C-alpha cells in the first residue's frame, strides 16, 4: 500500500478515540500536523531528524529549528517555516518525478539547507521565519498568512509568489459540515476566498479571515429565516 503522511496521521487520530462525536470529528478534520516519522510515499527525508547540528555548523540553527518543531503547520511556527522552505527548495532543486521512494542523504539535506539559508537571508533578512511569513493566501489585493503544507490533513500546496514567498494554489477549499441532531439539520460552511468571482463584489474575498482561522459560518435552508435576515431581496432579471 502507498500510505502517506495524511493517511498515517488520520489513522493515528482515529485510533486514539473509542468513539468520535462531532467535536472530535472537527478536531481531526482540522488537524495540521505531520506524523512521526514523516511518511511521504515518494521520498524519505527522515535523515534530517538524525543529523547532529554540531556536524553541520553552517546550518545548525535550521536543523535545530526543524528537529525541535512539534510538526504543526501553524502560521506562527518557525519550525514549520524552516521546514516549508526546506521542502519547497528540495522539490525545486533536487527532486525529480522519475524517482520514487527516494531516500535523501544527510549530505544532500545539508546542501539543501545551505540554499534555504541563503534564501532566508536574501528575502527575509533572518533565519527564523514563521510559516505565515513565507506562505500566503492571496485573492485580489488581500494577502494573509495561511496554515498547512502538502500532505497534512489540512493540505496546502503552493507555488512561487513574490519576494521569496509562496502562494497557496491548491488544497483546502469549500468545506461543509453537517450535523443531524434533535434540533434538525445543522450546517456550517466556509470557502477559501469568497462566494463570488466578481472582483467588484464584497464577497470576492470576504471569507478569507474566517477560513485562515479554521472558522465557519452557519447556513440555513429555512426560507423564513433567510428572508428575515437577508440584507437585500430582489428578483433576477
Residue ranges and their predicted role:
Residues 1-43, 49, 55, 61-237:
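C-terminal/peripheral segments of proteins
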Amino acid at each position: 500500500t502507498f500510505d502517506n503522511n495524511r493517511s498515517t496521521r488520520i489513522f493515528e487520530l482515529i485510533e486514539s478515540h473509542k468513539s468520535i462525536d462531532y467535536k472530535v470529528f472537527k478536531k481531526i478534520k482540522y488537524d495540521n500536523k505531520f506524523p512521526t516519522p514523516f511518511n511521504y510515499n515518494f521520498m524519505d527525508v527522515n535523515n534530517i531528524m538524525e543529523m547532529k547540528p554540531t556536524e553541520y555548523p553552517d546550518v545548525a540553527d535550521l536543523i535545530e529549528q526543524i528537529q525541535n518543531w512539534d510538526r504543526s503547520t501553524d502560521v506562527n511556527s518557525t519550525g514549520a517555516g524552516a521546514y516549508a522552505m526546506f521542502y519547497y527548495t528540495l522539490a525545486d532543486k533536487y527532486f525529480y518525478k522519475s524517482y520514487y521512494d527516494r531516500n535523501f542523504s544527510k549530505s544532500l539535506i545539508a546542501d539543501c539547507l545551505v540554499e534555504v539559508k541563503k534564501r532566508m537571508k536574501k528575502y527575509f533578512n533572518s533565519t527564523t521565519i514563521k510559516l505565515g511569513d513565507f506562505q500566503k493566501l492571496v485573492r485580489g489585493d488581500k494577502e494573509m498568512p495561511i496554515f498547512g503544507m502538502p500532505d497534512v490533513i489540512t493540505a496546502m500546496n503552493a507555488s512561487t509568489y513574490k519576494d521569496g514567498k509562496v502562494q497557496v494554489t491548491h488544497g483546502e477549499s469549500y468545506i461543509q459540515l453537517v450535523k443531524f441532531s434533535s434540533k434538525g439539520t445543522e450546517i456550517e460552511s466556509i470557502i477559501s476566498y469568497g462566494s463570488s468571482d466578481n472582483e467588484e463584489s464584497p464577497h470576492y474575498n470576504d471569507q478569507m479571515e474566517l477560513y485562515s482561522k479554521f472558522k465557519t459560518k452557519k447556513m440555513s435552508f429555512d426560507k423564513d429565516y433567510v428572508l428575515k435576515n437577508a440584507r437585500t431581496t430582489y428578483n433576477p432579471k
